[in-house]
From Swiss-Prot:
Belongs to the Lgt family. Its EC number is 2.5.1.145. One of its GO terms (biological process) is lipoprotein biosynthetic process. GO terms for molecular function: phosphatidylglycerol-prolipoprotein diacylglyceryl transferase activity. This is Phosphatidylglycerol--prolipoprotein diacylglyceryl transferase. It is a multi-pass membrane protein. It is found in: Cell inner membrane. InterPro entries: Lgt (IPR001640). Pathway: Protein modification; lipoprotein biosynthesis (diacylglyceryl transfer). The lineage of its organism: Bacteria, Pseudomonadati, Campylobacterota, Epsilonproteobacteria, Campylobacterales.
């Protein structure tokens, strides 16, 4: 257990270097997550015989990836970053992967910002190709949660988004302070548990779009719980009634998903 508690003291966030370019474990985990999401999407298209051809699926993932990156980065800057005004006046720095001449990748991403970017990209894609967005959204609800697990593992390997101070034996030392390995809590609850819920819901699905709403509700609830063990974002802290910004956004997300679900399922709103 002692090795685990001091794992950050014996671990390098850089996996290897290629011609002087440092490749971080976080980047590797991000690529694994993206590839897994695509493979799972292809699997579920075949398994449930969805009306999505492979060409459209590949194109859709490209659109969504662009939307997610833009939304995640802009969302972080507008919601969490303490230097928002700097980026507004220096927009070319938003996606600058270098700090003092060293390649460090793009740091600072917001999940809730990624959701907005993802939804916008989906709507634009489906409008261009005249397809039903709910089919793609339900597919994402099935294919993303397990891939999300690797994203949180990437956060752990990158030594970021760590937990609150604790005395549990499985805690890890960060700057000499024992903290919850909250990234793994999130990987389990927001990834594995959410996937199980959405997958089971698929077999009782009563309308298109139900799975993405189930995903939104399940994820936001899981995230709300995990935030109790995760250190509040630097520079923001607790925002309202002892809640973090992540909890407030998750609460809004949960209520929105619940209201849309009720309107569609019980009021027979056409989608």
């Amino acid at each position: 257990m002692e090795f685990w508690q001091h794992i950050y003291s014996n671990f390098n966030v850089i996996a290897f270097s290629i011609f002087g370019l440092k490749v971080h474990w976080y980047g590797i985990m991000y690529d694994v997550a993206l590839l897994l999401a695509l493979l799972l999407a292809k699997f579920f298209v075949r398994k449930f015989q969805l009306d999505i051809n492979e060409k459209h699926l590949y194109s859709y993932f490209i659109w969504v990836e662009i939307g997610v990156i833009l939304g995640a980065r802009l969302g972080y800057i507008l919601i969490y970053d303490a230097n928002t005004m700097y980026y507004i006046t220096h927009p070319w720095q938003i996606f600058n992967p270098y700090i003092n001449g060293e390649f460090v990748g793009i740091r600072g991403m917001s999940y809730h910002g990624a959701i907005i970017g993802f939804l916008i990209a989906t709507l634009l894609f489906c409008k261009k190709y005249k397809t039903n967005p709910w089919i793609f959204l339900d597919l994402v609800a099935l294919s993303v949660p397990l891939a999300y697990v690797f994203g949180r593992i990437g956060n752990f390997l990158n030594q970021e988004l760590f937990g609150r101070i604790t005395n549990v034996p499985w805690g890890i030392y960060i700057d000499g302070v024992l903290r919850h390995p909250s990234q793994f809590y999130e990987a389990f609850l927001e990834g594995i548990v959410v996937f199980i819920i959405v997958y089971l819901a698929r077999f009782k699905q009563s309308f298109q779009g139900e799975l993405i709403l189930v995903y939104a509700g399940a994820y936001s609830l899981a995230r709300f719980i995990c935030e109790f063990y995760r250190e509040p974002d630097f520079g923001i802290g607790f925002v309202l009634w002892g809640m973090s910004m992540g909890q407030i956004l998750s609460f809004i997300m949960f209520i929105t998903a619940l209201l849309v679900y009720i309107c569609i399922k019980f009021k027979k709103v056409n989608i």
